[in-house]
């Protein structure tokens, strides 16, 4: 009956939809619900539909875009900002897909496209501004190169602050866990970066005035 009556969701207030979707995304069985009720989820968020079953044609990915997204959600802390960022981080991929002559799929510009789509979706669902800003930032930077190098990590901390930087590293790690086995070696890099963040902060190398010890 849920699948049959999914159109009724269109009559429910965005705020109510947001509460229920957030509960579902953060629940223990989120992956199963996302698989079994993808069509229902696509009523309030139709932008998800192109992801369902979309092949990536890339050795770094052994899953379609939707299954990869579910794997990332499963691998990340069940906290609203992180789970929503995981849901939306690759939403722009299908519209950015191109197939090279060698048969390898590419998604050039998908971070920008996903960011734009995430902003639109989160606004439509009446997200509070602070959460929306955090989620959009994570989507925007989810594909940036991360190395276990102090200088760029200090720059990240300076630009985004501790909490957002830690969230970003966690999303990168979850994203990698959702990719094929040949990418798994990168997990160690994110572990190293997390440790590096701890060391930098312990040394009180603070870069924003509000974080300076007075």
Description of each model-found segment:
Residues 39, 51-54, 90, 134-142, ...:
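A glycine-rich phosphate-binding loop feature that marks nucleotide/adenosyl-phosphate handling sites
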Residues 17, 33, 68, 87, ...:
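General structural feature for long, well-ordered alpha-helical segments within catalytic domains
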Residues 2-6, 21, 33-34, 44-48, ...:
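Generic structural signal of hydrophobic/aromatic residues within well-ordered alpha-helices
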Residues 9-12, 28-32, 40-45, 55, ...:
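Short secondary-structure junctions and interdomain/linker hinges
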Residues 1, 120-124, 176-214:
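Charged substrate- and nucleic-acid-binding regions of tRNA-handling and nucleotidyl-transfer enzymes
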Residues 1-87, 91-109, 113-127:
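Glycine- and charge-enriched loop/helix tracts that form the active or gating conduit
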Residues 79, 83, 136, 163-171, ...:
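Active-site lining segments that contact anionic ligands and/or coordinate catalytic metals
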Residues 56-74, 127-184:
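Histidine/acidic-rich helix-loop-helix segments that form or flank divalent-metal centers
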